[in-house]
C-alpha cells in the first residue's frame, strides 16, 4: 500500500473500463479475464460487447456494466431506454447513463428526471447516472444529483472521462449532497494508486478506470509508487 494511506483493497472498487473506440473482441476477453482474476467490481464496455462479456463472466463475480447515451447524453429519451433495455437483455446488470446536459442547463429538470426514472423502473438494474461534473457549476451538480436520486439512481458518477476527470473536490461535494443514500463512482483520469486512494477517502465507492491493472501493480509494488 502507498505510504501514508490506510490499508484499502482497491480491487473491489474498480469498474474495469474498456471504452476506447478501437476496442476489439480480443481486448474484451482480456478485460473480462483481468476483472475476474483481480476481483474487480465490474468490466465496463460499450453495448456492442455486452453479450460477449456476459458469456465470458457467466457464474463469475465481476458484473457486466455498459454505458448508455455515451458520451454526450444527447440522444433521445426513447433511444436511451431502448439501448438500456437491449443491454439488459444481452446480460448487463449495471448501466452508466449520461444525463441530458442541455435539458439540465436549460432548466428542463422534468425531462432529466423522466429519462432517468424510466430507465431505472423499466430495467430494474443498477443505474449509475453520469453527471459530467466538469461541465457543471456546483449549483447544477446539486440539482442533477437530487434529480438522479429522486429518479431512482443507485450511484452518481462524476464523469465520462471525455471532458476531464474526477476530482477529490467533486467527490466530497457529492458525498455531502447524497449523505450516503447512493453510491459515488469517480471516473476519468484515474492513473495512480494515490489518486485512487484519495478519491476513495473522499467518498468514492466505485472507481471507473482503464488503468485497473496499473493500480494493482502499484498496490503490489509500493516501493515504486511515487
Swiss-Prot record:
E.C. number(s) listed in UniProt: 4.1.2.4
Keywords, alphabetical: Cytoplasm, Lyase, Schiff base
Gene3D superfamilies: Aldolase class I
Predominant location category: cytoplasm
GO molecular function: deoxyribose-phosphate aldolase activity
Function in brief: Catalyzes a reversible aldol reaction between acetaldehyde and D-glyceraldehyde 3-phosphate to generate 2-deoxy-D-ribose 5-phosphate.
Matching Pfam families: DeoC (PF01791)
GO BP of this protein: 2-deoxyribose 1-phosphate catabolic process; carbohydrate catabolic process; deoxyribonucleotide catabolic process
Organism: Nostoc sp. (strain PCC 7120 / SAG 25.82 / UTEX 2576)
GO cellular component: cytoplasm
Protein's name in the database: Deoxyribose-phosphate aldolase
UniProt pathway annotation: Carbohydrate degradation; 2-deoxy-D-ribose 1-phosphate degradation; D-glyceraldehyde 3-phosphate and acetaldehyde from 2-deoxy-alpha-D-ribose 1-phosphate: step 2/2
InterPro entries found in the cross-reference section: Aldolase_TIM, DeoC, DeoC/FbaB/LacD_aldolase, DeoC_typeI
Active site: 96, 157, 185
Source lineage: Bacteria, Bacillati, Cyanobacteriota, Cyanophyceae, Nostocales
